[in-house]
Amino acid sequence: MTTPTFDTIEAQASYGIGLQVGQQLSESGLEGLLPEALVAGIADALEGKHPAVPVDVVHRALREIHERADAVRRQRFQAMAAEGVKYLEENAKKEGVNSTESGLQFRVINQGEGAIPARTDRVRVHYTGKLIDGTVFDSSVARGEPAEFPVNGVIPGWIEALTLMPVGSKWELTIPQELAYGERGAGASIPPFSTLVFEVELLEIL
């Protein structure tokens, strides 16, 4: 396959669309896709050609490759969910860790003396979020700017914690996947069924 040049608007836009499609497919979990065949399919569709592969064969192949991806995803995420449960069990034994009825765990790093937010309040916080392997996926501290949001506009584990924390407090939260993003995850940085660890400092009720 010859390498195209990208010296026209049309070529640059076409390449950009290809990048977007490729990124979506890369994140889909579908394995074994062949770029040459993918490009051929796009070209046939754009040029209005008769499909080179019978439609029923295409549908069968698509079904099979999706089933394979689903099986791999289930196996991977079941293991991740189990790791989260084990992490929570071990974390609950640590000194200073409190567990609520919902399964939320928190450790007080610093206890403030201010007001406690209601679900209807808007708050300003600093936070760092990690996966249980220590990978940081988001941090207002690293950005150097606190985050502001309504209490009832975040994940359930955060809502519960914020409505227990006095202003001025800094807590470490360990949030079961059921109180976080559950089976859907959140983009590429938070896989499905992830138990999450946050260090949260409640700065102000707005």
Curated annotation (Swiss-Prot):
Instruction: Report the activity regulation comment.
Output: Strongly inhibited by FK506.
Enzyme superclass (EC): isomerase
**What are the PPIase FKBP-type domain coordinates in residue numbering?**
120-206
Reaction catalysed? Answer: [protein]-peptidylproline (omega=180) = [protein]-peptidylproline (omega=0)
Q: Which PROSITE patterns match?
A: FKBP_PPIASE
The enzyme's E.C. designation: 5.2.1.8
List localization entries: Cytoplasm; Periplasm
Q: Which GO terms describe its biological process?
A: chaperone-mediated protein folding
> What assembly does the database describe for this protein?
Homodimer.
What is the protein name stated in its UniProt record?
Answer: FKBP-type 22 kDa peptidyl-prolyl cis-trans isomerase
Q: Which organism is it from?
A: Escherichia coli (strain K12)
